[in-house]
Amino acid sequence: MVHLTPDEKNAVCALWGKVNVEEVGGEALGRLLVVYPWTQRFFDSFGDLSSPSAVMGNPKVKAHGKKVLSAFSEGLNHLDNLKGTFAKLSELHCDKLHVDPENFRLLGNVLVVVLAHHFGKDFTPEVQAAYQKVVAGVATALAHKYH
């Protein structure tokens, strides 16, 4: 559960309505793989991840980034029940994929950077604070199965 004020919730939803999920998702996942290269080990089947340009141009990275951000988008519709919304993904990432749950926090922070890059002045400190709450809540929900 994420506790947002009505103003924070409005800010998150207003900005999210402008997000190109495919573009932002691909960039966010790509940046995660470049900035934190140890996360690449979960994406062996994605082909060439040998350089930042290879990662950022990789169609499988872009496609999976879109998939990740689509799930995040669904979570925005259920801020009062993030654990329930992400229960199956938490189980998958814990039991089958064995992803370090810290990676969820890292991806959330990278997403905030990408949103700031894309929205510039519209991504005010207040909007950032609201998004930090949301990505922290999503990361906690995705890590729930690990506890």
From Swiss-Prot:
Binding locations of heme b: H64, H93
GO function terms (MF aspect): haptoglobin binding; heme binding; hemoglobin alpha binding; metal ion binding; organic acid binding; oxygen binding; oxygen carrier activity; peroxidase activity
Name of one Pfam family that matches: Globin
Residue ranges constituting the Globin domain according to the UniProt record: 3-147
GO BP, one annotated term: hydrogen peroxide catabolic process
InterPro entries the UniProt entry points to: Globin, Globin-like_sf, Globin/Proto, Hemoglobin_b, Hemoglobin_oxygen_transport
Tissue: Red blood cells.
GO cellular component terms given for this protein: blood microparticle; haptoglobin-hemoglobin complex; hemoglobin complex
PTM-bearing positions, type Phosphoserine: S51
Keywords recorded for this protein, A-Z: Heme, Iron, Metal-binding, Oxygen transport, Phosphoprotein, Transport
UniProt xrefs under PANTHER family: HEMOGLOBIN FAMILY MEMBER (PTHR11442), HEMOGLOBIN SUBUNIT BETA (PTHR11442:SF42)
Complexes and interactors: Heterotetramer of two delta chains and two alpha chains.
Family, as annotated: Belongs to the globin family.
Descriptive protein name: Hemoglobin subunit delta
